[in-house]
Every structure is written in structure tokens, then in C-alpha cells.
Amino acid sequence: MTKLIIHLVSDSSVQTAKYAANSALAQFTSVKPKLYHWPMIRNLELLNEVLSKIEYKHGIVLYTIADQELRKTLTKFCYELKIPCISVIGKIIKEMSVFSGIEIEKEQNYNYKFDKTYFDTLNAIDYAIRHDDGQMLNELSEADIILIGPSRTSKTPTSVFLAYNGLKAANIPYVYNCPFPDFIEKDIDQLVVGLVINPNRLIEIREARLNLLQINENKSYTDFNIVQKECLEVRKICDQRNWPVIDVSTRSIEETAALIMRIYYNRKNKYNK
């Protein structure tokens, strides 16, 4: 496989550059990437340390840096080394400016990240953690989204992923022969989504979980008939209330969350008309 070095340089968490890099790398199955993360680069001293690393290990540079002087220093350095230096959002900003006729602001303040959206995300993450696995059901009215499904159908990581996108998500497990919370009998405004999975796949996941925890005596947890009934019952609950159901058998966490967000915003736009 072809080895490819990518340096991710950012004045924040490098997540934007990382997402862009991974999206692009998905198009190259024969590439073995090595990603170097250089977050919180906000002054020349820190940038010079990174430049020495880049000089030692040449590779493509992806960056998200607000400070104009730091950008100039980085791009000039890469130009002299004859290595690609790509602004992840630079082209987008330029096109927005050209299309709107609004001049790009020269002075940037790092406090731009700490706006309402930033704090909404923090609150959503806190909410997802506190309302994981059926906890604090008395606060479901504060949720944007409620996920229900059998154990190990990726409810928790999906809730957290939604939280990183500013949406408060609670998740409630469905366990065979156990009473389900009575919220399902009430008229609620929140979007409720059922997560189900192929029973055989779910058994594999649960067996791996039990092996990891070194638990041997929990036959019902991996019994095919019970697992199948759990998934069927979740479908039944959702069908009766016209709640959407997503089969996560072949979906990644990101794909599941993206589909949920699409449903959520379509629903929200419909009600806001």
C-alpha cells in the first residue's frame, strides 16, 4: 500500500481538518495514511515547532487557522518545501465573500468559537451523558430526540454524536419482558426513533461484549428468539405510534446519526412552515 503522511494543523481541535482528511481518504483504498495532529496552534512559537516536524516528515498539510500572519507563515514554508498546503475552509470563505459581496474580516477573535452554538453543544453533551440508558426519564421533555432500542444497538454513541451536533438526545433500552417506560403512552413533541439490528449481528456484538467483561452466565442476552423478539417489539411500538425505525445492521454511527438529523430537521421545517 502507498503510504501518505498528512499533517493536520489547527488553531482549535483539528476536528474539521480531520473530518475533511478522512472523507478524502475514503476515496483511496490503496493508501495507508499517517495523520499527525497539531491542535491549538495560536502563536508563531507553536507554529515554528510544527514546521520543524513537517520539515522532518514531509506530507500534505491541511489547516484551519484564523490568524492571517500564521497562515502566511505556514503556506510560505510549505511552498518552499514544495509540499501541498490546503486550507480546509479557505475556498468556502472566499466563495461566500464573492457571492455575497461582503468583505472578509481581517481581524479575527478566537472568542468566535464560544458563541451560542458552542454552549448549546456543551449542554447537549451533558444532557446525553445524564440521560443515557434510560436515566432521568422525568426530564425527557427537554430532549430534542429520544432513541429506543434493544441493548447494543449503538444508542449511546449515536446520542453522543447527535450531541456534538447540538441536539439533546436521550436513549432508552428495550429489554424483553421488562415494562417499558410509560412515556410511550403520552403525546410527546420530541422525535422518537427506534433502532433495530439483524438478530444474528446483534448476538455477535453481545457475545463479544460478554467475553470482554468475562461474563458467562447470561443466556437470555444472546438467545436468538429473545433477541429477535426485542427487535420485533421495538418495531411494533414504533409502528403503532408512527415513529421512524432505523436498521443499524450495516450503518456506521455517523450514518445513523446523519439519517436521524435529516428526519429531525425535515420534521422541524415542516412544523415551522
From Swiss-Prot:
Its EC number is 2.7.11.32, 2.7.4.27. It comes from the Bacteria. Keywords: Kinase, Nucleotide-binding, Serine/threonine-protein kinase, Transferase. It is an enzyme of class 2 (transferase). The keyword Kinase applies. InterPro entries: Kinase-pyrophosphorylase, PPDK_reg. One of its GO terms (molecular function) is ADP binding. The keyword Nucleotide-binding applies. ADP binds at G149, P150, S151, R152, T153, S154, K155, T156. It catalyses: N(tele)-phospho-L-histidyl/L-threonyl-[pyruvate, phosphate dikinase] + ADP = N(tele)-phospho-L-histidyl/O-phospho-L-threonyl-[pyruvate, phosphate dikinase] + AMP + H(+); N(tele)-phospho-L-histidyl/O-phospho-L-threonyl-[pyruvate, phosphate dikinase] + phosphate + H(+) = N(tele)-phospho-L-histidyl/L-threonyl-[pyruvate, phosphate dikinase] + diphosphate. Belongs to the pyruvate, phosphate/water dikinase regulatory protein family. PDRP subfamily. HAMAP family: PDRP. Bifunctional serine/threonine kinase and phosphorylase involved in the regulation of the pyruvate, phosphate dikinase (PPDK) by catalyzing its phosphorylation/dephosphorylation. This is Putative pyruvate, phosphate dikinase regulatory protein. It comes from Rickettsia rickettsii (strain Sheila Smith).
